[in-house]
Amino acid sequence: IDPANAAIAVQGMGNVGGTAAEIFYKNGQKVVAVSDYTGGLYCEDGLDIPAIRKFISEGNTLDKYEQDGVQHVTNDGLITCKCDVLIPAALENQITEDNAGRIQAKLIIEAANGPTSVEADDILNSRGIIVCPDILSNAGGVVVSYFEWVQNIQNLTWDLDEVNKMLQKIMLTAFNKVYAL
């Protein structure tokens, strides 16, 4: 998957999903689908994530969002939409044996706790779809908490860029070790 051209779908626009969608958008990547508990939005050409985040921050839900070229989809529709990368960042058991055969993503990054059932995981594996497990995908917060602890006990101060570089190094090393399994 070429990150620069990857179509990304994010289920859940809370702290994890919303932030992930915003980071992808700011990095110039195409976020084609997002959702909240009321349903989702899909646009093959990419969504305006800052506008959607502003809309949500004003107390609105995605079922009320309107923009030319944007289609409303169900949460299951988001899970099975045309995309390269799928990030379930909402609830557990969103990818099941009922929808795993219809998933079009080549890579799934589990940002929610337990979003994929065991049966679905077997189906995805048999189809060659890579799943980055939640225990790895969620580890970034724990790693940064460790960095905060180290800074406090050693009276250090690291800027955000330094923290992000250290986090990226640790997470990439962990991912590569898991992927090699």
Residue ranges and their predicted role:
Residues I1-T80:
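Glycine-rich phosphate/diphosphate-binding loop of Rossmann-like nucleotide-binding domains
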Residues V73-C83, L91-I108:
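Rossmann-fold NAD(P) dinucleotide-binding segment
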Residues G101-L181:
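Adenosine-phosphate binding glycine-rich loop
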